[in-house]
Amino acid sequence: MPRKGPAPARQLPKDPVYGDTIVSQLINKVLVDGKKSTAERIVYGALESCREKTGTDPVLTLKKALDNVKPTLEVRSRRVGGATYQVPVEVRPGRATTLALRWLVMFTRQRRENTMTERLAAEILDASNGLGASVKRREDTHKMAEANRAFAHYRW
């Protein structure tokens, strides 16, 4: 075990266009093969498309979408004796945001629209309206936690 304690969490810089760290995180999740400018073009294009469709601030739409996708509970495997139990645990705020962004981008890639920009915009709009595959993933995660509530006393 290190004697110095845990390393401090790095602060992510705000993105240059909207001045928000959530947008920076989204850009980093969309990033493939280190092509940051391509990822920025995709994210900014999707946010601009959201602005045109809703007529509101796209960052607020993104945050609303993330609030609808963020899980509050998840299950983690815990081995007790010879059995492995799925133990429901609360999700820390930072992890909830990370999971929400991960799911949003994962289900964006599975959509059928033509360009990645269109897919991301559609998934953000669906999630902000409580629809879409990423919101369904959160519901499934919560159902799994509820189903395994009997094992909650194994929490650590």
UniProtKB/Swiss-Prot annotation:
Q: Which GO terms of the molecular function aspect are on file?
A: rRNA binding; structural constituent of ribosome; tRNA binding
The biological processes this protein is annotated with in GO are:
translation
- Which InterPro entries would you find in this protein's record? Ribosomal_uS7 (IPR000235), Ribosomal_uS7_bac/org-type (IPR005717), Ribosomal_uS7_CS (IPR020606), Ribosomal_uS7_dom (IPR023798), Ribosomal_uS7_dom_sf (IPR036823)
Q: Which UniProt keywords apply?
A: Ribonucleoprotein, Ribosomal protein, RNA-binding, rRNA-binding, tRNA-binding
What is the superkingdom listed in this entry's lineage?
Bacteria
Q: Which residues form a coiled coil?
A: none
Q: Which Pfam families match?
A: Ribosomal_S7
The answer to whether the entry has keyword Plastid is no
Under the cellular component aspect of Gene Ontology, which terms does the record hold?
small ribosomal subunit
Question: Subunit info?
Answer: Part of the 30S ribosomal subunit. Contacts proteins S9 and S11.
Q: Which family, according to UniProt?
A: Belongs to the universal ribosomal protein uS7 family.
State its role. One of the primary rRNA binding proteins, it binds directly to 16S rRNA where it nucleates assembly of the head domain of the 30S subunit. Is located at the subunit interface close to the decoding center, probably blocks exit of the E-site tRNA.
Protein name, please? Small ribosomal subunit protein uS7
* Native species: Corynebacterium kroppenstedtii (strain DSM 44385 / JCM 11950 / CIP 105744 / CCUG 35717)
